Structure formats: C-alpha cells, structure tokens
Amino acid sequence: MKFKLTKKEKSWVLYDVGNSAFTLLVSTIMPIYFNYLAENAGLSDVDYLAYWGYAASIATLVVALMGPICGTMADTKGYKKPIFIISLCIGAVSCISLGFAKNWLLFLVIFVIAKIGFSGSLIFYDSMLSDVTKIERMDNVSSQGFAWGYIGSCIPFIISLVIILGSDVIGISMETAMTIAFIITATWWIIMTLPLLKNYKQKYYVEKKPNAVKESFARLVRTFKNVRKEKKVFLFLLAFFFYIDGVYSIIDMATAYGSALGLDSTGLLLALLVTQFVAFPFAILFGRLAQKYEAEKLIMVCIVAYFCIAVFAMFIASQLHFWILAIFVGIFQGGIQALSRSYFTKIIPVNQ
C-alpha cells in the first residue's frame, strides 16, 4: 500500500528539502572554497583540515550545550515556531554572508554561526514531528523527510555546480560564482520553509508561565531526573550523543579530507552528488523496514556500518576509494538519521 503524506506532513518534509541544501553545501562546495581561501593565505593542507575540523567541532559543542534548554523551551506554548524562525534566519543570513567573506578566518567565524543557526532550527523542527503526524507514522514520515531532502537538495546544488565549474565560460570570477552559490542555497532553504510556516500548529505544549525561561530550566532539571529513572531513554540519549556526532563528522569532513589528500575537486563533488541519489531510496527503504523490524535493531545495523565506513576512510588513497565511500555513506546515512529522529520522538514524552 502506497504511503501518502498529509498536508501538514508534506509541509514538514519540505523543510528537510530546504535545509538539506545547506547540509550538501557544507559537505561539498564549502570545504573546497575554504581550501581555496586558505591556500591564498598561505595555510598548509594540514592547517586547512585542522581549522575546518575545529570550526565544525565548535559549532557542534555550542549546539550540544544549548540544545537541552532550547528543546525544553520548544515545549512551551507559543515558543517553538518563533524561535525556529529566529534560528532559520541566523542560518540563512549567515549562509549568504559566507559568499562575501574573502578572509579565511572571517569565513570560519561566519560558518560557525551558520552551523549554529542551522542546527538550532533542527532542534525545533525535529520536535515538530509529533505535532504533524501520529506515532505509528513517524518512522515513515521521518524517512520521507530525509529521502526528499537528499534528492531535492540536488537541484540548487547542481545549479550552483554548473555556475562554479562554468565560471570562466560565463565570464565571472570564482569568488563571484561562490557568492551566487551561497545565495541560491539560502534562497532555496527559505522558500522550502514557507509551507511549514504557513501550515504548522503546535499541538503538544506546556502552558506558558510568567518567567518562561526560568521555568524552562526548572523543567529541564525535572526532565533529566525523570530520564535517569528511565534506563532505556537514558541509554539511547547517551549513545545518540556520540554516534550521531560521528555521523555528522563524516558528512562535514568528507570533502575536506579528500581535498587535503589531493583528490580532484570535481570528482569529489560528483561522488557526493551520487551519495544523495543513493540515499534517497535507502532512506525510504529503512522507513518501511521499521514497520517490520524494531527501529533499535535497524539503528544498530547502521551504527556498525558507519563504524566500518570510518575505518575504510582511514585508508583512502584514490578517487575510486572515495566513490566507494560515498556510495556506502548514501546507503546508511538516511536510515540512521531518519530512524534516530523518529525513535527519539517516540520514546520521549511529547511535553518533555
């Protein structure tokens, strides 16, 4: 039986289509452009890779620290959508600003801000899943989001890639081509968000109290105490913190790593484009498998696969190796992201 999305579910899925364009930009074009800026400033490949890794880590750390309180505030009536919009604006405006940063250090600072805005929006976006669908549909809806995100993000990426690779033919500089690419990505991101902003209504919430921020901290403390009593929830949260960071590290660092190894930039971009097309059907497949098998077991399969992928990445020595890596990442990337999101939403009470 064909799985059909409701209007609210479609609006929610479209945000994945929008924000995935930024994710693809971060994992493909952005590291190569930063390498270009770094080389012009006299930085070595070792320094370039290290600084890029530091920036990604700083953004991850900031989001990890602010995540719990943001998640708690998201449950307060009337807070989720406005703070989501603020995070979106920070991410999108910073994305555009990256195109005008010609200094490598300034570029990194803006990148960290863009990453924080992007990741912050996902905290509120993921929490919207319980508001737009039923618990028995979450695995499929979450998988559809990632699947269409992978394939939909290819549209602005391909347009940007054509402009960048054909900059000489068009008669524009590399810097101008990159600026256009950042603007295209941010515009796509914002446009794909509009249906969600129009159709989303918060269904589950706790009533707003006079001092909402203070109450959010108090509720966060209570939630942590409750989580400690729930062994299953506690262990998943602990594991999730580590394995999902590993997944995103591989996504963020893949192109930078390949570029530092001296692999052809065009080949790297095309390989990661293939990752998107491979990830599309497998994200949907994992969503359907979750209807027959336990999500926990499927997540474990993906974790083991990602461990093998990380080990294989240590021995990359050619373009062919990178293509093999890209294909296997595509197979398991959608599954581990989609199932983790829906499983997390299902085991956590809607108002916590």
Predicted regions: what is each one?
Residues 2-10, 201-238:
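Juxtamembrane intracellular "pre-TM" segments in multi-pass secondary transporters
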Residues 2-60, 232-271:
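Helix-loop boundary and gating motifs at the non-cytosolic
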Residues 65-79, 281-295:
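Helix-to-loop junctions at the C-terminal end of transmembrane segments
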Residues 82-97, 297-312:
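Structural signature of the two symmetry-related core transmembrane helices
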Residues 97-111, 314-326:
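Helix-loop junctions at membrane interfaces in 12-TM secondary transporters
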Residues 120-134, 335-349:
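Intracellular juxtamembrane helix-capping segments at the cytosolic ends
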Residues 142-164:
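Glycine-rich segments within core transmembrane alpha-helices of 12-TM secondary carriers
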Residues 156-168, 186-205:
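C-terminal membrane-cytosol helix-exit motif in multi-pass small-molecule transporters
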